[in-house]
C-alpha cells in the first residue's frame, strides 16, 4: 500500500458544521461536518508527519415544520457554505496495548450564509479540533481493524453576536469520542465510523446544545491507482437541548428542533499520485426530518428547521516527513 493511500484511509479528518450562519445554537448546529469521515478507515499509515488539505461546499435549503411556522411557507430559503481546512497527522510509531498511536490537529476556515427571509452571512475561523489520541488495532491477517479516539473542539474560533453564535466559532467546548471499524483487504475499504458530539454550556447564553450522533459509511475498491465506491452518512440529535436558569433565550428551547435525523447517499472517486493522494466525494441528503414535541405541546406549533442539500468535498493528503528519509538540502543552499 502506498503511503498516500494509507494516509487517505487512516486520517480521521473532521471538519466543521455549515450551520453557523443561523446565529443560534441548538438544533442542527453540529461542530463536525456530516460525512467528514467518509473515505477514512481504522488503519494507520507508516510513521511520519502528514498534512491534508480539504475544501468543500454545501448547497442546501431549509426544510421541516418551521417552513410554515417560521418562514411563511418559503421552501427556497437557501443555506450555503464554503470551507477550507488544513490539518496535520502525527504517527510517531508508538504502540500501546497492541494498538498503533496517532494524533491530529485540524484548523478550518469557513464562510456561510442563509437566504431570505433570514439574510445573514458570516466568515471566520472555526474552533480548532485537537485529537490528542487515536489507537488502532489490526486484527491479525483478517483484514479487520478497529480504531478509537477522542476529539476536542476548543472555543478559539471567531465569536460574534449577542449570544456568541453569530460567526464560525462557538463559546463552548465539544468532546467527540469516535469508533471506526474497517475491513481492509484486497483493495477494499469497508468502513463504518461512529462519533458523537457532547457540548458544554455556552458561556454567554447559558444554552446547552443536545448530543449529536454521526455515522459515516464507506464501501470503496482500489483498482490500480483509482479508488471508487458508494458512500453514505447519517447524523441526528439524540438528546434534548437545555436552557436552564440564567439562559438568555426568552423562548427557551421551543424555537429549536429537539430531534432531527438526516440521511445522505453518494459516491467517492480517488487517485493515488504516489507522493500525494486526491479524493473527491459528493453526497445528496435524501431524507431530513426535525421535530420539537415540547413546542407543539406548549404552543400548538412546531418551529423546527434543518438544512437538506448537497455536499461536494475534495481532499489532498501527503507525507511531509518520514523518520527513514534523510534530510533534503535546501534549494537555496550554497
PLM regions: where:
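Cleavable N-terminal export/targeting peptides
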Residues: 1-30, 321-334
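Hydrophobic, lipid-facing positions within transmembrane beta-strands of outer-membrane proteins
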Residues: 49-51, 55, 82-88, 126-133, ...
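N-terminal, post-signal peptide beta-strand-biased segments of exported outer-membrane/organellar beta-barrel
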Residues: 21-90
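Transmembrane beta-barrel outer-membrane domains
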Residues: 77-83, 121-127, 168-174, 206-212, ...
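Outer membrane beta-barrel transmembrane domains
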Residues: 28, 56, 64-72, 206-334
Amino acid at each position: 500500500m502506498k503511503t498516500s493511500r494509507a494516509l487517505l484511509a487512516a486520517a480521521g479528518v473532521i471538519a466543521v458544521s455549515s450551520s453557523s450562519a443561523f446565529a443560534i445554537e441548538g438544533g442542527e448546529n453540529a461542530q463536525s461536518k456530516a460525512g467528514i469521515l467518509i473515505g477514512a478507515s481504522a488503519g494507520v499509515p507508516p510513521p511520519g508527519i502528514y498534512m491534508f488539505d480539504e475544501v468543500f461546499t454545501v448547497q442546501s435549503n431549509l426544510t421541516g415544520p418551521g417552513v410554515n411556522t417560521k418562514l411563511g411557507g418559503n421552501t427556497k430559503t437557501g443555506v450555503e457554505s464554503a470551507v477550507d481546512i488544513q490539518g496535520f497527522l502525527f504517527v510517531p510509531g508508538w504502540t500501546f496495548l497492541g494498538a498503533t498511536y496517532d494524533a491530529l490537529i485540524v484548523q478550518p476556515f469557513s464562510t456561510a450564509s442563509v437566504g431570505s427571509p433570514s439574510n445573514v452571512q458570516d466568515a471566520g475561523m472555526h474552533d480548532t479540533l485537537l485529537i490528542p489520541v487515536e489507537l488502532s488495532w489490526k486484527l491479525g491477517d483478517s483484514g479487520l481493524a478497529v480504531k478509537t479516539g477522542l476529539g476536542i473542539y476548543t472555543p478559539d474560533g471567531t465569536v460574534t453576536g449577542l449570544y456568541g453564535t453569530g460567526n464560525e466559532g462557538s463559546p463552548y467546548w465539544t468532546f467527540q469520542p469516535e469508533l471506526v471499524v474497517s475491513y481492509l483487504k484486497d483493495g477494499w475499504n469497508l468502513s463504518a465510523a461512529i462519533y458523537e458530539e457532547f457540548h458544554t454550556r455556552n458561556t454567554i447564553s447559558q444554552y446547552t446544545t443536545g448530543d449529536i450522533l454521526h455515522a459515516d459509511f464507506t464501501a470503496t475498491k482500489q483498482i490500480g491507482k483509482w479508488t471508487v465506491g458508494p458512500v453514505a452518512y447519517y447524523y441526528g440529535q439524540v438528546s434534548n437541548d437545555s436552557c436552564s436558569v440564567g439562559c438568555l433565550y426568552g423562548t427557551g428551547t421551543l424555537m429549536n428542533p429537539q430531534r432531527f435525523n438526516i440521511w445522505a447517499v453518494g459516491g467517492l472517486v480517488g487517485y493515488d499520485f504516489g507522493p500525494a493522494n486526491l479524493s473527491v466525494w459528493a453526497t445528496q441528503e435524501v431524507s431530513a426530518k426535525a421535530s420539537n414535541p415540547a413546542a407543539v405541546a406548549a404552543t400548538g406549533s412546531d418551529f423546527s428547521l434543518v438544512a437538506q442539500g448537497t455536499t461536494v468535498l475534495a481532499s489532498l493528503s501527503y507525507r511531509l516527513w518520514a523518520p527513514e528519509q534523510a534530510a533534503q538540502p535546501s534549494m537555496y543552499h550554497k
